[in-house]
Amino acid sequence: MESKEKRAVNSLSMENANQENEEKEQVANKGEPLALPLDAGEYCVPRGNRRRFRVRQPILQYRWDMMHRLGEPQARMREENMERIGEEVRQLMEKLREKQLSHSLRAVSTDPPHHDHHDEFCLMP
């Protein structure tokens, strides 16, 4: 009987100790967080104990995460420039193809040459 009573007392004391520890953790967690992300690279400094506050590590991780999540701005600009340059090259190639085609069709056609084409020459006397 005594061993059962001792076990019951031990289990009650353990439960009380666990509840006290949980209450202490809840009180400790109610304090302000160490760092809160605001904007890119900005963090809120807590008003409490500033000795425990480490600025460098969270900011480095946050900036690294932001760079890999959003992509580097230079890389995005390079992609946009490549798309724009590719479009310009495509338009120039299309214009060049049209001019070459028009010159080849004019050489085959039977229409008399117009006087505004100074780069053409005529072999007729």
Curated annotation (Swiss-Prot):
InterPro entries: BEX (IPR007623), TF_A-like/BEX (IPR021156)
Primary location recorded for the protein, binned into one broad class: nucleus
GO biological process, one term: negative regulation of protein ubiquitination
Annotated localization: Nucleus; Cytoplasm
GO CC annotations, alphabetized: cytoplasm; nucleus; transcription regulator complex
Pfam families hit by this protein: BEX (PF04538)
SS bond partners: none
Tissues with expression: Expressed in central nervous system, with high level in pituitary, cerebellum and temporal lobe. Expressed in lung, skeletal muscle, peripheral blood leukocyte, stomach, lymph node, trachea and bone marrow. Highly expressed in acute myeloid leukemia.
Source taxon at top rank: Eukaryota
Phosphoserine modified-residue sites: S102
Region of interest called Disordered, as start-end residue ranges on this chain: 1-33, 104-125
Its job: Signaling adapter molecule involved in p75NTR/NGFR signaling. Plays a role in cell cycle progression and neuronal differentiation. Inhibits neuronal differentiation in response to nerve growth factor (NGF). May act as a link between the cell cycle and neurotrophic factor signaling, possibly by functioning as an upstream modulator of receptor signaling, coordinating biological responses to external signals with internal cellular states.
Descriptive protein name: Protein BEX1
Species whose genome carries this gene: Homo sapiens
Lineage of origin: Eukaryota, Metazoa, Chordata, Craniata, Vertebrata
